[in-house]
Amino acid sequence: MADLQKIVDDLSALTVLEAAELAKLLEEKWGVSAAAAVAVAAPGAGGAAAAPAEEKTEFTVVLASAGDKKIEVIKEVRAITGLGLKEAKDLVEGAPKPVKEGVNKDEAEKIKGQLEKAGAKVELK
């Protein structure tokens, strides 16, 4: 049981980029695709009788582009995510990329405002 707790602690300490890399490695190792699992878990097409769509409660903040002030955007990404300089630079240069996932609407709007103030183009998904 202590081994499982250590794994949980180690996974919790990963940055967003490290978690994404881990997901890719596990997909390759196990021969699966995370996208396929999401498609299977998604509800089937329901037609008009489906329940009304609920308001989204979790958002992903996606950096669409860094704009002209790339250095300012990198600084803001570091402040928001806690990433190191190289990881933040790679994230910004690899746009479009998710900056923060699974955040509530208020936090997503706040992060979007911070990044846009720094000169980035941002989307909420």
From Swiss-Prot:
InterPro entries in UniProt: Ribosomal_bL12, Ribosomal_bL12_C, Ribosomal_bL12_C/ClpS-like, Ribosomal_bL12_oligo, Ribosomal_bL12_oligo_N_sf
Claim: Ribosomal protein is one of the keywords in the record: yes
GO cellular component, one term: cytosolic large ribosomal subunit
Pfam families, alphabetized: Ribosomal_L12, Ribosomal_L12_N
UniProt KW keywords: Ribonucleoprotein, Ribosomal protein
MF-aspect GO terms: mRNA binding; structural constituent of ribosome
Keyword Repeat on entry: no
Listed Gene3D superfamilies: 3.30.1390.10, Single helix bin (1.20.5.710)
GO biological process, one term: translation
Oligomeric form and interacting partners: Homodimer. Part of the ribosomal stalk of the 50S ribosomal subunit. Forms a multimeric L10(L12)X complex, where L10 forms an elongated spine to which 2 to 4 L12 dimers bind in a sequential fashion. Binds GTP-bound translation factors.
Function, as annotated: Forms part of the ribosomal stalk which helps the ribosome interact with GTP-bound translation factors. Is thus essential for accurate translation.
Similarity remark: Belongs to the bacterial ribosomal protein bL12 family.
Name of the protein in its database record: Large ribosomal subunit protein bL12
Organism: Bradyrhizobium sp. (strain BTAi1 / ATCC BAA-1182)
Primary gene name: rplL
